[in-house]
Amino acid sequence: MRKIILFALFTLTTLSAKAHSQEEQVNINVAGIDLAISSNGPSSPSVHTFSRHTKYRSHLALFELGFNIPTNVSYGTTEPWFNLINAKSTQYTFNVFSVGTRLSPNGTVGLSAALGITWSNYVFETPTRVQRTDGMLTAEPVDTKGWVKSKINTFALHLPILLEVGQRKGFFAAVGGYGDLVVGSRSKIKYSKHNKEINRGLNLPLLQAGVTARVGYRRVYMFGNYSLTELFRNEGPSTNILTIGLGIGF
């Protein structure tokens, strides 16, 4: 966790330094509230609320909703079990802290980064129990009597970095990458009458990374994330996750 926070602070410091050296502004968004750090020189920084005169504003939205789709699934010698209901396998992302700076004189090209949290759900089509047994990740069917749903949840710190092209208050497109620090994972089986079974600590990869693209208008956009890191370690099925969804900001 320390490494990803330090990296986020390093990114902010780098963008701020660039802005100061060029007598520009770095715009910071904290939970939907905009601030602008400006400087007429290295010794005269100031912080003020966002205004219409601000040179550049990140397009990263405060909230993103996506749907997880497994790709390149391979089970090796094990029985297939990672079959998801894609419409229910959702991902929620809150970009709590974001920063942006322009890279072109007219402000049509910019660099954005954010630090947020991501909650991912992988909902199975059939009743499935996923747990670690003797150091291995195992999956087995469970009784359908009283069964409501079974799923895997992950919780991660999220750091996207994007190169944006477009109008500050209009249409834009962006490409970049992201890194996730997975701080929690669990499987859950829910039964009727409010009964449930939870298995924690699935030992998923701590660090996950991928590529991302966005296209939209102001802070409303469609996005796609593709994980270059497999969801499971060698003990689980081989799969990369594609997430497609919508971002909404202020």
What is each residue range found by the language model?
Residues 74, 198-250:
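Predominantly the C-terminal beta-signal and adjacent terminal strand-loop region
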